[in-house]
């Protein structure tokens, strides 16, 4: 309990100082590391952009001072794989980095495969937390259903582990993750301290801006993708060729309690999600029919 109080105090204090430009990054990570030298948390990390992605490596650099990290990530981009698993052929993994408190594997499978492999073969002990990300791109609203980053944390939640997905609304390979650092530590520490109910996880999205207005706890906005298919010249190839593209259509643009609203107004959007897809509101009507 004392350890939890220290974590809670520090995460709030660090974010306050950072927001007022009073706490340099080196002091931030050093101060956390001082309190975490014993009984360091053990965190499993994966993503859908691959083990070489900037977002993943920024996350590693941020959290390695406060936790022991096991990273099992795809060996290349796997965006849009959601919770897909590989069953038609074997997968393989290669150790690509090993140092004190950090082990990194590159896996040929999907993000969900990576979590399954880690939990069944590579963990030293049961992880205290599983993190997906940092994703290059927006995983708010309906995007969460397609996301391999969310696939990571959903698989963890299925296994009874607390899990958090981090995404930045910037698809650039050279995206600037610097403003995220204190929030990554703060949210990670709070997730470690408080835990999460079984079969739930957090979807955390950061807007693309140099400084955030704060954190908003919000629901998923209702939206859908439209204009999703673009014709492509077949260039002599057989059959019809297309690009899957599209525009995200907001279905409730005036709602102020959604992740899309929070992001558009400069807030970090934290959305609690659940694995239970039951439409409970439909049950009374269906029972009356059957």
Task: List PLM regions with ranges.
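Hydrophobic/aromatic ligand-binding patch that stacks against planar heteroaromatic rings
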Residues: 152-156
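A cross-family phosphate/adenosyl-ligand binding-site feature
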Residues: 38-39, 43, 54-121, 125-126
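Extreme N-terminal basic, low-complexity initiation segments
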Residues: 1-13
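Short, glycine-rich nucleotide/cofactor-binding loops
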Residues: 45-52, 143-144
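Glycine-rich phosphate/pyrophosphate-binding loops
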Residues: 157-179
């Amino acid at each position: 309990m004392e350890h939890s109080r220290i974590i809670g105090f520090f995460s709030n204090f660090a974010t306050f100082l950072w927001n007022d430009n009073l706490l340099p990054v080196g002091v931030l990570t050093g101060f956390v590391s001082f309190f975490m030298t014993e009984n360091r948390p053990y965190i499993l990390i994966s993503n859908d952009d691959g083990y070489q992605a900037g977002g993943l490596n920024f996350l590693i650099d941020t959290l390695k001072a406060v936790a022991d990290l096991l990273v099992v990530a795809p060996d290349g981009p796997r965006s849009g794989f959601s919770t897909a698993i590989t069953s038609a052929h074997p997968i393989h993994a290669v150790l690509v980095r090993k140092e004190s408190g950090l082990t990194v594997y590159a896996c040929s499978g999907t993000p969900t495969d990576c979590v399954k492999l880690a939990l069944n073969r590579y963990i030293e002990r049961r992880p205290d937390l599983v993190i997906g990300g940092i994703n290059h791109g927006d995983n708010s609203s309906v995007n969460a259903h397609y996301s391999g980053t969310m696939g990571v944390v959903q698989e963890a939640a299925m296994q009874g582990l607390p899990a958090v997905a981090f995404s930045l609304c910037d698809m650039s390979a050279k995206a600037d993750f610097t403003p995220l650092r204190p929030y990554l530590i703060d949210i990670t520490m709070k997730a470690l301290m408080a835990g999460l109910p079984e079969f739930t996880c957090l979807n955390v999205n950061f807007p693309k801006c140099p400084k955030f207005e704060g954190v908003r706890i919000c629901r998923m906005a209702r939206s859908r993708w439209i204009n999703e298919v673009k014709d492509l010249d077949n260039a002599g190839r057989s059959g019809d060729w297309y690009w899957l593209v599209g525009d995200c259509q907001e279905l409730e643009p005036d709602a102020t309690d959604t992740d899309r609203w929070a992001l558009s107004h400069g807030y970090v959007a934290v959305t609690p999600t659940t694995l239970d897809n039951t439409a409970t509101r439909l049950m009374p009507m269906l029972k009356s029919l059957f």
